[in-house]
Structure formats: C-alpha cells, structure tokens
C-alpha cells in the first residue's frame, strides 16, 4: 500500500492528503472488482490505473471553479474524473456537489454504489 501511495506524490501541489490517497485506493479496488462484469477500464490498464487514470483525472482539479457549488461530469462511465474530483473535494472539505450523468444502467449503479461507500457529495 505504501508503494502505491508514493505514486501520488505528484499531486502534492493540490494538497492531496494521505486520506485522499487511501480513498483513491478504495475506488481502484471497486473498479477492478466490477471491471470483469461491466468493463469499466481496459484489462491492460488495471496494472497502471494510478498513473494512467487517477493522477490524470486529479490534475483536472486546477480547472474547477471553487466558487461554484456544482460540477458536472457528463458520460461519467467509470467515474473518472467525477469520482476522483469528488474524493478530493470531500477531503478538502469543499462543498461542491458533483452531478454524474451516465446512460448505462449498470455503470450508473456502479457510480451510486461508489458514491455511497465513499460518502461522496454526488
């Protein structure tokens, strides 16, 4: 686990806490667990999900208007970037709600489950 947390050091400029990184890891385990059933990411990306998906999505934080109270993720699919950014906002105690829109029933249910398990403002 500690080795995985070191990968997130690139996000220090965004004040990403250890707790946030641990929640990223919980999210990753949910993606991998559900990936076999609903194809959330390519099988090849499971090994490098942190670098290829999580860190990329977290860098979008710089483009969010922190004075807004809503952020929208259209075509949320596997929850990236919406879930990643919602995790960051929660741990920074910023009151921005993330509206996640996904047309696939199974992916929508996955997003609902993740949001509840991680207690996100979505």
Regions found by a protein language model. Give the residues of each.
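Class I SAM-dependent transferase core
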Residues: 2-66, 106-107, 113-118
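Conserved SAM/SAH cofactor-binding pocket of Class I
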Residues: 58-122
